[in-house]
Amino acid sequence: RDSFYNKHNLTPFLDSLMSHSLIFNNTYSNGLRSIEALPAITASIPTLSNTPFISSVYAQNKFNSLASILSEDGYSTSFFHGGTRGTMGFYSFCKKAGFQSYYGLEEYNDNKDYDGTWGIYDEPFFKFFAKKLKEEKKPFFSTFFSLSAHPPYSIPIKHKNKFKDGELDIHK
């Protein structure tokens, strides 16, 4: 396998890691939508019903997550998402899952980077994320949930017409 994105070499750094990594070619998705990803990835809770776990009555149950387990081992834990606190129930889930810190649009506090729909554009929010990680003083676990994979796929003006259009709306 030459790249993560089939015949297109769009992720050269990640591709360079493949020869030094354990790669799983056959995997199973534990959800179909973004709202289902956070519980699946951080707490091993797959989507088993038509209602995402975060929105279900089961979200009130006690459960362990990477954040809660690592917190017990002395790690600081944080979650970053450029949207508002109420978006997709992430803030409530993160508190219940044991994340010590939550950073979103309100914590970023600079509306000039707002995409007009979801929250802060990914590029400036990734820079904010990197700055916060550099401030960590002890072992840490952090999760970043980006906004760019959601319609209407807003692109900052400085990046318009910079890339060739692809086959899907997200590639335009």
Model segments located where?
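Solvent-exposed soluble domains appended to multi-pass membrane proteins
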Residues: 1-172
